[in-house]
Amino acid sequence: MGIGVVGVKLLLSPHALPAGHSLFFAVGAGPPHDGVRKAKRLNLSRDLRGIAALAARFPGAAVLAFGFGDRAFVLARHEEIGVAIGALLPSPGLILVTALKDSLEAAYGARYVVVLLHVSPAALDSIAWFIWYSLATKCGRRPPPYGPGPCSGSLFYASSVRYDGFYTCNTWAAEALGAGGLPIQAAGVLFAFEVMREARTLASH
């Protein structure tokens, strides 16, 4: 939802800016970045349409963070070489949803980079729908949690997307950005730094 070995997380908020844009966040590990300090508390003023049924499970959240990963690897209690190797093969995916009520600094600390991208409400909605279709839903209904997440305010959900060595958490994040119409190249993306590099380029324009 980490970087290097951890992966890119998507942080969504439907809070409308005066200019009529919404905010989208990509998070990765690395040195502190000024973007973190600019991202103060956000007010979740309305549900994201694509994931409205899911967002309703996290009342009071300012931001929802999403991360994709290999189910067996994510749920493993200990780091085992067999589980790590298994993650390179096509395997069931898992999505971690984390509700953030504090500032991004309090939630992620200085070791994470936060890149702020201004997108239109329509683009944010498309990204939300991409996430919804990545969940293992039945007849479009709100999926039940697969299990509790690693921290307070987080839940795991089964994914309809399969994870493998050529489709990682970072590939998924890049595809989500692309679903919102952002010029992000998802094909061939495997590592977090690739997504973060493109996100920084977009943020600088």
Can you describe what each PLM-predicted range is?
Residues 2-5, 133-205:
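Activation targets extended, charge/polar-rich intrinsically disordered C-terminal tails
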Residues 12-13, 17-26, 30, 37-158:
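Non-catalytic ligand/cofactor/substrate-binding and regulatory segments of enzyme domains
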Residues 1-17:
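Membrane-interface motif at the C-terminal end of an N-terminal transmembrane signal
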